[in-house]
Amino acid sequence: MIREIIRMGDKRLLRVAPPVTNLGSDELHALVADMFETMDAARGVGLAAPQIAVDLQLMVFGFEASERYPEAPAVPRTALANVQIEPLSDEMENGWEGCLSIPGLRAVIPRHRVIRYSGFAPDGTPIEREAEGFHARVVQHEYDHLVGRLYPSRIENFDTFGFEDVLSYDL
């Protein structure tokens, strides 16, 4: 079922989400299916549970090819609960970001270039991966949603922030 994506200004996006406690449950599997369906319908590359007004540390992400980010390499489709992120270097990388909760806008955001992330699949299987580049960016962006943060709070140069159909800033 496609869920409504709440937008910036809704205070539910600013809360720290509690951990998932029902790993392996039918309810969690149904929620994950809804999240993937919602993400795909919105042509997104990731979605966090708080974006559909579900207060849980849960994210989905991944794609073979993205209409919104055509230059981005494929990212494995993943559902991840109770996420932890560790930067593997101090190296930061600037890149364009948008958000399904902030439709039509984009900005250049600095993110760690290489990270290790861990958590649990919906069935309770542990997941631990290293990611770099766009894959790392997507995971960090979705993680921000789990801790009540939206990408505009990370903007360093507001000349890069604007509507997708108007922006002309080059990286």
Curated annotation (Swiss-Prot):
Reported cofactor(s): Fe(2+)
Gene Ontology process terms (BP): co-translational protein modification; translation
The reaction(s) this protein catalyses: N-terminal N-formyl-L-methionyl-[peptide] + H2O = N-terminal L-methionyl-[peptide] + formate
Pfam families for the chain: Pep_deformylase
Gene3D superfamilies: Peptide deformylase (3.90.45.10)
EC number, as in UniProt: 3.5.1.88
Function per UniProt: Removes the formyl group from the N-terminal Met of newly synthesized proteins. Requires at least a dipeptide for an efficient rate of reaction. N-terminal L-methionine is a prerequisite for activity but the enzyme has broad specificity at other positions.
Family: Belongs to the polypeptide deformylase family.
Identification of the protein by name: Peptide deformylase 1
Lineage: Bacteria, Pseudomonadati, Pseudomonadota, Gammaproteobacteria, Lysobacterales
Gene, per the UniProt record: def1
